[in-house]
Amino acid sequence: MKLKMLLLSSTPPGSPGGQADTNTTPATPTTSTTAVDSTSRQLTTSKQPQQTETRGRRYGRRPSSKSRRSQTQQRRSRSRHRSRSRSRSRSKSQTHTTRSTTRSRSTSLTKTRALTSRSRSRGRSPTTCRRGGGRSPRRRSRSPSTSSSCTTQRSQRARAESSTTRGARGSRGSRGGSRGGRGRRRGRSSSSSSPAHKRSRGGSAKLRGVSPGEVGGSLRSVSSKHTGRLGRLLEEARDPPVIIVKGAANTLKCFRNRAKIKYMGLFRSFSTTWSWVAGDGTERLGRPRMLISFSSYTQRRDFDEAVRYPKGVDKAYGNLDSL
């Protein structure tokens, strides 16, 4: 309403809507016009900042609040605190591990030193027991277990001597075994080797072989002594067993060829076919013959049980002084 009144009052007197006031003075319309201008300016100025504010809010950047800054700072400080605590815990664990490793190394070093000291004391103890107790009392104080070590050494020597004597008894059968035993005994001890050498030599002399004069000396079967396989073979070699076969020459040759392949290992050797000749001339007497030799009586028995002789062939057992 005030604005309407002001506008009505501000109309010029010559306009059709307004009437001329003769009583009024000309100074009043100027004052009213100035007031209207000032009010309109104030309204326009008040509208302009509002428009700029709305434009800034729509398209401009939001101002950062104090609360958001404080929250981000708190988060950063918390993350820094956590990282510091983690680094501290890691450093502590590393220090603990280094301490444990150093402790284990120190304990291992102490153990190795103790073991080396014990081995040194054990290495020194046999010298003390050899020299005697009166000369070195200090070494006794260092190694209190000298008597036990001496006893153990004596027991070991006794065992070694017994093993050497057993080896000498077991190596009577072959020359190679006796030679190997000699080399070992020389490396072990020269004092204990001499009686063992004598025993092994005496035993090997009996089992070396059979002299020509002794062949066929015993015409009995081999006794069941505990002489071993080699001794039994050597005793049976004194009178080797033989089978003599009589028959036609061709049948004997065929039988020999078959037996060499079929009965391998059940005989020692085959002879060729032969025949007796009369003393007055060169005529053959009787049928041809063939000899089959064996290394033992058991081998001859096994051969005789396994072989099937051809028809028209006769057999007979025998022994020879030598083959």
UniProtKB/Swiss-Prot annotation:
Record carries keyword ATP-binding: no
Listed transmembrane segments: none
An example Gene Ontology biological process: regulation of DNA replication
Protein name: Protein E8^E2C
Chief site of localization: host cell
Main function: Plays a role in limiting the replication of viral DNA in keratinocytes. Recruits the host NCoR/SMRT complex to viral replication foci to mediate repression of both viral replication and transcription.
Segments of skewed composition (Polar residues): 41-53
GO cellular component, one term: host cell nucleus
Disordered: annotated segments: 1-233
